[in-house]
């Protein structure tokens, strides 16, 4: 067991497109989506110990410990492997909550991947992903760590290699719960499934965007503003919206014009997760 503190990235993702093809009786939706990581990250500093306890800092406002995905991921990993070890986990929160960029799922995945290494558990990525999907449908993509085309409820992954563009990401002054969008009676749920090559050659869209723009005027305003400058879309169920650019200079120019009431970021697409890169670096340091 490594006993020193190590720092792990917990990256955001974008849904470059998102199509909803149907709904299961259990409420989950059939979808087709293209995930890409971005280099905007939370960070987890993890210090393993032999206490058997999982402690967290700082608390996330409005989130009880038992509902914290970091704590749930760590305790689930303990229980699955009968691991007697513990850890203190400190979260540096950058990613906006309720933004549709996978912050909570990414935190859970980083916890699973990091503790699997730090506790020397040797679970495969598939085993970690199978644990993670019980915490959230997006957790497997963060565990596997490659950009991917996803089907099913998001768990069927096929590696993909979209262009690593620059993005201006805006978080409107509203947080959106995924369940509120997916349960809306007017949400599009019958988009026909298409082969990946057809989807990649068409213009990218998000089936959640129409209803989100209508229900949340803050999203509509920021997306309308971005569309004046570049191709722009909602990611996931929102609230974050993004515009895409070929180079950093163009992104920087539009970023400089963002309205004062908006929270924005410049970021770049990454087809290999920063988490994967960190894991390989730690393995190299430990001669694994």
Swiss-Prot record:
GO terms for biological process: isopentenyl diphosphate biosynthetic process, methylerythritol 4-phosphate pathway; terpenoid biosynthetic process. It catalyses: 4-CDP-2-C-methyl-D-erythritol + ATP = 4-CDP-2-C-methyl-D-erythritol 2-phosphate + ADP + H(+). Catalyzes the phosphorylation of the position 2 hydroxy group of 4-diphosphocytidyl-2C-methyl-D-erythritol. It is an enzyme of class 2 (transferase). InterPro entries: GHMP_kinase_C_dom, GHMP_kinase_C_sf, GHMP_kinase_N_dom, IspE, Ribosomal_Su5_D2-typ_SF, Ribsml_uS5_D2-typ_fold_subgr. Keywords: ATP-binding, Isoprene biosynthesis, Kinase, Nucleotide-binding, Transferase. The keyword Nucleotide-binding applies. The lineage of its organism: Bacteria, Pseudomonadati, Pseudomonadota, Gammaproteobacteria, Vibrionales. ATP binds at residues 96-106. It comes from Aliivibrio salmonicida (strain LFI1238) (Vibrio salmonicida (strain LFI1238)). One of its GO terms (molecular function) is 4-(cytidine 5'-diphospho)-2-C-methyl-D-erythritol kinase activity. This is 4-diphosphocytidyl-2-C-methyl-D-erythritol kinase. Pfam families: GHMP_kinases_C, GHMP_kinases_N. SUPFAM superfamilies: GHMP Kinase, C-terminal domain, Ribosomal protein S5 domain 2-like. The gene is ispE. The active site is at 13, 138. Belongs to the GHMP kinase family. IspE subfamily. Pathway: Isoprenoid biosynthesis; isopentenyl diphosphate biosynthesis via DXP pathway; isopentenyl diphosphate from 1-deoxy-D-xylulose 5-phosphate: step 3/6. Its EC number is 2.7.1.148.
